[in-house]
């Protein structure tokens, strides 16, 4: 494999693992041989990716790509029926139903933040169509869950939360012309308060936690792309 160290570092970052500077951790490796664990579409498991799950082609290589094309794969929400409209419903706790208005606001926020971060990528040109040197970055959110009840009943009750919800981000790298998948990562994270402490739930604090989570994912992606391109150019 060409530029193996750089490639595996990119997979690790794209899999949204933590960059552990100064810590002794095993490097990520793509399983190979007859005993390699394969995904449903033939990708090889990446060991030590420091993410929930990551796979890649055994010949994974991004040489030749100079542009990136982000493509949304949609958002799927957890099937929660509790709308928290009564005291009894509230006593059951979350997850809570996410209405169309909240879904629209969430999806708009995700799109804005990822677009903002990808526009900062220095080593790849951002495009909106396939091409011979275009890498498709396909991302989708699954099982989006909300632990936030609707507005307080009677406007009096206070709600304190340490986590307002969570979601799973699935990221795929594909060749834009053929659709061939090169790598996939799956990462589930919670939108939590700093330090996991309880704080009063309101629209301002809840929005802040959601933005922090989305920004975390988007920034890791941007840094991974720029870091890989820089290392490839120096080799």
Name each region found by the language model.
Residues 97-109, 161-162, 204-215:
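Soluble non-cytosolic domains of exported or imported proteins
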């Amino acid at each position: 494999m060409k530029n193996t160290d750089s490639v595996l570092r990119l997979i690790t970052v794209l899999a949204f693992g933590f960059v552990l500077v100064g810590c002794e951790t095993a490097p990520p490796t793509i399983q190979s041989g007859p005993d390699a664990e394969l995904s449903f579409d033939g990708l090889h498991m990446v060991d030590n990716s420091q993410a929930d799950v990551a796979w890649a082609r055994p010949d994974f290589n991004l040489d030749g790509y100079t542009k990136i094309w982000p493509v949304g794969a949609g958002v799927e929400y957890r099937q929660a029926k509790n709308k928290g409209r009564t005291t009894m419903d509230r006593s059951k706790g979350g997850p809570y139903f996410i209405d169309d208005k909240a879904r629209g606001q969430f999806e708009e926020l995700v799109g804005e933040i990822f677009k903002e971060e990808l526009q900062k990528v220095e080593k790849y040109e951002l495009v909106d169509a396939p091409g011979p040197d275009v890498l498709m970055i396909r991302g989708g959110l699954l099982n989006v869950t909300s632990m936030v009840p609707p507005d307080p009943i009677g406007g009096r009750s206070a709600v304190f939360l340490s986590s307002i919800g969570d979601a799973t981000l699935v990221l795929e790298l594909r060749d834009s012309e053929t659709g061939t998948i090169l790598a996939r990562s799956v990462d589930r994270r919670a939108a939590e308060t700093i330090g996991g402490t309880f704080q009063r739930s309101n629209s301002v604090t809840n929005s802040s936690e959601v933005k922090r989570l989305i920004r975390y994912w988007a920034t890791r992606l941007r840094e991974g792309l720029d870091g890989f391109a820089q290392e490839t150019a120096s080799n």
